[in-house]
Amino acid sequence: RLVGSEMCIRDSYTNEPDTMYARAVDYLEKRKYEQALEILRPYEDVNTAIAYMSLGYDKAALRILEQSSQTAETQYMQAILNARLGNEQRAVSLLLSAAEMDDRMRFRANLDPELSLLVKKYGLFKEDDLW
């Protein structure tokens, strides 16, 4: 989930929108990750992490997300990155935490190719099977 371009203000005195940032978000939405990253690199925010993650720069993405505010979304993305990096226990812990914050993450993880294997392997969210 992208952070909207309206969230980034270039000049705190005039509240002038950062049009370059808006362009980068547009690139992300169009899956033009290299172009997005060129603009986003200095921001070091969630969208920068999404661009890194989409290009396979998992350690860079994880570094940024670990320093970001811990929401269900950021913890979910960290779970994916940890799974990619072979840190299964950390991935499971982050996924469970994300699901505690937002129940929709359980459903999402079952459909996610990078996390559904961990869900099955560790028997996560079994109580969801009851209904």
Task: Name each region found by the language model.
Residues 1-4, 8-11:
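Single conserved hydrophobic/aromatic residue that forms the stacking wall/gate
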Residues 10-13, 34:
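Flexible helix-coil transition and linker loops at the boundaries of alpha-helical arrays
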Residues 25, 32, 101, 107-111:
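Non-membrane alpha-helical secondary structure
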